[in-house]
């Protein structure tokens, strides 16, 4: 019908004209017509109009409530979506599987584990826990939220898991860094007579790359050929990535060269592979080839190339990348900024790094750590400690990395008083027994010739390793106590 063709903000005016004609005909309050109007306004991006129409519907049913919830979930306004969900239950309207599926998209986006758990409990209470599609959606939600325990629980309690549920479980393991477990599940799935799908192969290749298992990766590559998936772009990209992560760059390059429809992901995984193996020049060369093929870089491309520039110490390439980043409007993205600051520091351009840092509207702990680390590595201990003070004044909470870097700054300046102040801050955060933090504290006290304090700290460490002993010995040696 005419309303279904109004499906984007460009059609909002046309939709309002249709709405006026419906009001004139007196059908606006009809539940079916009203629900269609809600969906139309949602697709046109006008949640205010959708809400007004919904409030005028007589005897709203589960479909109209779900349409309203879906409207807010689609635009990431999950708080409002949950408010409608609560109102729906208060009015004794029972949600259906579609209601929950609409919600879960919002939980994916926000990675809202608590809200996802609430929805899961509600679906169980409403006897919807046997719906395979809904189970899979919940399993994927828990995977995205990093809750592997919930992923395993749903799978184990499913009577007859199909390939979709198996894929979700394998993906859950692979995405959360459990590559070995993911591959064990894949093998078990095969033993139970369930054929591998393209999604299974993708998850398996991700797992192989995570644990550098090129043998199982090659077996999956054979499966790709057997299933005729050699032209499937996501599969090809995953093969390039897997071989690169396993250090087989020649094979990765061969697979890449055979891809006829390469996209930005294809280039990114190969560039990343070379850079991770510290073949930075090859990574930059690939970036130039990518431009010649007319593929536009994205933030991942720049992250890889900035790392390559840092490895090379190439300010010329780095500044060229920076200019492109600005031209594409990516200069305010935190990960890009962190890498830019790191690149300029590693190239020895500390003033430029400071300028990039200062231009950001807000600085997170990672960015502060990058700056402080850069100062310490270049011997600017005083600037590192000043930055630490500014970081605290900005109410950014330091991490173990922050403390390790600032303690190194104190050691380089033999600034015992400042070291003791940092020690107090470490104790307040309960980090003094972490091996690296504790060992750096020992080193700071020993370097500043407070051997009594260094020895007392060494005794307090839960485990004394070669790192902590070396920290003390280095302090003694520095002050001529080599014996």
Regions from the PLM with identified roles:
Residues 1, 6, 11, 75-102, ...:
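Hydrophobic or amphipathic alpha-helical targeting/insertion segments
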Residues 15, 30, 34-35, 50, ...:
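Pentatricopeptide repeat
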């Amino acid at each position: 019908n005419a309303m279904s063709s109004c499906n984007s903000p460009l059609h909002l005016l046309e939709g309002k004209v249709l709405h006026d004609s419906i009001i004139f005909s007196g059908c606006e309050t009809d539940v079916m017509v009203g629900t269609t109007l809600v969906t139309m306004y949602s697709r046109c991006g006008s949640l205010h109009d959708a809400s007004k129409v919904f409030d005028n519907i007589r005897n709203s049913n589960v479909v109209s409530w779900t349409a309203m919830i879906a409207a807010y979930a689609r635009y990431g306004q999950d708080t409002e979506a949950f408010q409608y969900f609560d109102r729906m239950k208060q009015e004794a309207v029972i949600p259906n599987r579609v209601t929950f599926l609409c919600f879960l998209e919002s939980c994916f986006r926000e990675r809202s584990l608590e809200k996802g758990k609430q929805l899961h409990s509600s679906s169980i209470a409403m006897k919807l826990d046997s719906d395979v599609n809904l189970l899979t959606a919940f399993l994927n939600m828990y995977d995205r939220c990093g809750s592997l325990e919930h992923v395993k629980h749903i799978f184990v309690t499913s009577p007859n898991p199909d390939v979709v549920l198996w894929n979700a479980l394998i993906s859950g393991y692979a995405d959360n860094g459990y590559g070995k477990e993911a591959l064990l599940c894949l093998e078990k799935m095969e033993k139970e007579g369930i054929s591998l799908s393209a999604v299974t192969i993708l998850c398996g290749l991700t797992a192989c790359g995570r644990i550098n298992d090129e043998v199982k990766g090659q077996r999956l590559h054979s499966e790709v050929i057997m299933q005729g998936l050699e032209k499937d772009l996501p599969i090809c990209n995953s093969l390039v990535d897997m071989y690169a992560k396993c250090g087989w760059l020649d094979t990765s390059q061969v697979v890449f060269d055979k891809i006829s429809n390469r996209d930005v992901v294809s280039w990114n995984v190969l560039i990343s592979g070379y850079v991770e193996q510290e073949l930075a020049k090859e990574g930059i060369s690939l970036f130039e080839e990518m431009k010649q093929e007319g593929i536009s870089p994205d933030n991942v491309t720049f992250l890889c190339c900035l790392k390559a520039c840092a490895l090379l110490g190439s300010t010329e390439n780095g500044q060229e990348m920076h200019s492109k980043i600005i031209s594409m409007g990516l200069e305010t993205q935190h990960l890009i900024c962190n890498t830019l600051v790191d690149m300029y520091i590693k190239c020895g351009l500390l003033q430029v790094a400071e300028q990039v840092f200062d231009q950001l509207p807000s600085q997170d702990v990672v960015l502060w750590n990058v700056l402080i680390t850069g100062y310490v590595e270049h011997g600017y201990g005083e600037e590192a400690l000043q930055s630490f003070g500014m970081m605290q004044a900005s109410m950014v909470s330091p991490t173990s990395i922050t403390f390790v870097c600032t303690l190194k700054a104190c050691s380089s300046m033999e600034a015992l008083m400042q070291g003791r102040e940092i020690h107090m801050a470490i104790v307040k955060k309960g980090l003094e027994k972490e091996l690296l933090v504790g060992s750096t504290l020992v080193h700071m006290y020993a370097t500043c010739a407070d051997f009594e304090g260094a020895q007392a700290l060494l005794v307090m460490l839960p485990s004394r390793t070669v790192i902590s002993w070396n920290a003390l010995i280095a302090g003694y040696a520095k002050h001529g106590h080599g014996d």
